[in-house]
Design a protein with these regions (language model features):
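Conserved small-residue-rich beta-alpha loop and adjacent elements
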Residues: 137-176
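N-terminal Rossmann-like NAD(P)+-binding subdomain of aldehyde/semialdehyde dehydrogenases
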Residues: 2-147
């Protein structure tokens, strides 16, 4: 094949559009509605398709989270910290990809996007470090009137829904 034909073939190639799926219970199911919506960057340029979730999808996510709750709340603080630290390691390993995607999605310069990604990674490490310390800081004996003891200890309590803010979505999602 000649160089001219090779260049023409590359230019005529269609790009493959990314359509994301949900992440529920360790799997990537399609939305029950089968619908998607466009995700655009700060300038309105198309980035990807995202699933438009239905009530059933939300219910399935809550059921899966409740199913996983026993294992998560039963894990030691040290183990939970190791899991959070592993998330930070994985983000660090794909830092360049996250910097590129945050810059595209939010219309930021590479340096500002890198600062946001670095702050998000640092925050995961910070959270991981606090998992085995929070009980000593927040929990403990509470003074009460009379011959009683009032002890408190923080424990996981259940399913939480988190929505990322419109501005600074990646760092905002990690910070919530």
């Amino acid at each position: 094949m000649s160089d001219k034909n090779e260049k023409t073939e590359k230019n005529e190639r269609l790009s493959v559009f990314k359509t994301y799926k949900l992440y529920v219970g360790g799997k990537f199911p399609r939305s029950e509605s089968g619908r998607v919506y466009e995700v655009t960057d700060a300038k309105g340029k198309w980035l990807a398709n995202a699933p438009q979730s239905s009530r059933k999808d939300a219910r399935d996510a809550v059921v899966a989270a409740r199913k996983a709750f026993g294992a998560w709340s039963g894990a030691t603080a040290y183990n939970r910290g190791q899991i959070l630290y592993r998330i930070a390691e994985m983000l660090e390993g794909r830092r360049d990809q996250y910097v590129r995607e945050v810059a595209e999605a939010e219309g930021l310069s590479k340096s500002r996007a890198a600062a946001q990604v670095d702050a998000a990674i640092d925050r995961w490490v910070w959270y991981a470090g606090w998992t085995d310390k929070i009980a000593q800081v927040v929990g403990g004996g509470n003074p009460v009137a009379g011959p009683f003891f009032n002890l408190s200890s923080p424990e996981p309590t259940g399913v939480v829904a988190v929505l990322a803010p419109q501005e600074s979505s990646f760092l905002g999602l990690v910070s919530v």
